[in-house]
Amino acid sequence: MRAVNFMYSSNNPKFRGIFNGLCAIILFIFFFDQSDIYRNPLLKNLSFVDSSGKFNRGFSQFTVPRRHLSEVDTNGSSGNSSLSGDSTVSCSGLHEHRGYADQCEFLKSNPICSPDGFFDYLKFFYCSCRDFKILGYILLGVWLVALFYLLGNTAADYFCCSLEKLSKLLRLPPTVAGVTLLPLGNGAPDVFASIAAFVGSDKGEVGLNSVLGGAVFVTCVVVGIVSLCVADKEVKIDKKCFIRDLSFFLFTLVALMVILMVGKVTVGIAIAFVSIYVFYASLVAANEILRKHSRRLKLDSITPLLPMQGSVFSSPSVEEDIPMYSPLMELDTGEGPPRLHDSLPQWMWATNVAIYSNHFAKANVHDEERPPWGWTEDGAEVESSLCSKITSLLETPLTVPRRLTIPLIEEDSWSKTYAVASVSLAPVLLSFLWSSQDDTSLQARIVAYFIGIAIGSTLGYLAFKNTEPDRPPQIYLIPWVLGGFIMSIVWFYMIANELVALLVTFGGIYGINPSILGLTVLAWGNSMGDLVSNIALSMNGGDGVQIALSGCYAGPMFNTLVGLGMSMFLGAWSKSPETYMIPEDNSLFYTLGFLIFGLIWSLVMLPRNEMRPNKVMGIGLITLYLIFVTFRLSSAMGFIPWAS
């Protein structure tokens, strides 16, 4: 796994520290610019705050109908410019700003045009950076990268840790964990970005284009590059697994196409859509359990004189459970054949998101740079320590808020101070988020804060009395793990909601339909982990190629079924008993068409070449993706009128 870790940014802590420091500075700039913090969406409905951010003595409720720039026609979008409320403001007039001196005055007079987000990015760009547009582009661009980093880092350092612990506590077989918790860990950024687009920002078309765009990218570009990398290695792919995965994926896309054609979804339809993955996961788990059980029965009839890993008595299915890079000649101290491992290898848990992890960074620096005797003659140890302290200081604004609210019980990163603080502040954060909902009275908010503080104080006291400074708790682990799991989801939602709001802002600045940005920028950003990890796995050869290609199809299928399925379920639940209307975007059918064509291309080319990936398959898939991106961008810019 060292080859994989080397490709990640873990071996470059100085760059990571500088990047995190720059992101922290931008964060402080946004906070400083947000002089009117009570106008952000999380607090915009406080009954004692008026539209200008000043306290209202009469405590009268102030509400304003929100409207996104992307709800109007911008280079191919299909919305109209009429508001459902009493206001008749057309936010599409931002660039012309007729009747106003500039865009800043337009936004100040029409606050409903600002996209939902903690920070008002449009006002920051057009007002604070009015005379320094280049600086505004740079700051927003770096912050976009930072949000992608935070989304992936939360998955790698918090969410996957909780999933791994949960799998061990529940004693899930590796086959079951491999089709349930593992895809959730690797696909968490896509899933929660989709949910945030549907529920948080009410921009369902961004979520749809992000998930489907990521699926096209992974199944075409990543599979294409993997095919090119292993074309000369004559690696053979399991035919049954390949056909099974692609058949389920094609059925999923057909079902999604039917839902999009109908244009509306109910809670029952959303549950049925998610249940496709439940059936798929059950089938995979049952098949693997039966296969390994039959292998065990065969092994029982053969008793080798010297059981060893990789011997002639070991079947391929048994070796699948032996960790990578384990010794070839390792004697078994027990009797009989080698026993199967009861958990997934640790490195698999953050395969697709480990590129964002800080844990790998700390481990690699410690393992590779520190000499065995613990000191150096040239004072490099002091320099490394100083660099580490500076890096940690720069990372503080991005890491401390999450550490203070996400409970972790990792051996390497255990801290009683953070543990007590996290269980104390997590309920307060949940109370804050709940009280920021629409149509919540002042009395309900006060009660919510009181309950959050009371629960947090109680949990903090219990954690302080029942934990030790030098090691994590050994009892009551499930509440700790579930707490980390839930709070990781909360942070996912917050970061993903901000990411979608920033993409909507870029759509308003450039006059581009935000769904195109979801199809490209958001999809590419969330798929970088798949690209790096799957290529690295395939370069190792052997089972790595099978794992990489399986992930290229199982991952997007999970994101489509669970990500979009849960998004539609939450959207339908919020509109219940009425049906949830899916945002109309005819371009989604073109995306589905290209995605289906790419799957059929792979389904035809691999069996024709005896299940060996070759250059023809890889070049064909990459060419198909380039045609797809060119077609979608051209149609968005109006060069292909019939496709707009």
Curated annotation (Swiss-Prot):
Membrane topology: Multi-pass membrane protein
GO molecular function, one term: antiporter activity
Alphabetized UniProt keyword annotations: Antiport, Ion transport, Membrane, Potassium, Potassium transport, Sodium, Sodium transport, Transmembrane, Transmembrane helix, Transport
GO biological process: leaf senescence; monoatomic cation transport; potassium ion transport; sodium ion transport
Gene3D superfamilies: NCX, central ion-binding region
Observed effect of gene inactivation: No visible phenotype.
Tissue and organ expression note: Expressed in roots, leaves, stems, flowers and pollen.
Predominant place of localization: membrane
Top-rank lineage group of the source organism: Eukaryota
One Pfam short name: Na_Ca_ex
Keyword Metal-binding (UniProt): no
GO CC aspect terms: membrane
Function summary: Membrane-localized H(+)-dependent K(+) and Na(+) transporter.
Entry similarity comment: Belongs to the Ca(2+):cation antiporter (CaCA) (TC 2.A.19) family. Cation/calcium exchanger (CCX) subfamily.
Protein name, per record: Cation/calcium exchanger 4
Organism classification: Eukaryota, Viridiplantae, Streptophyta, Embryophyta, Tracheophyta
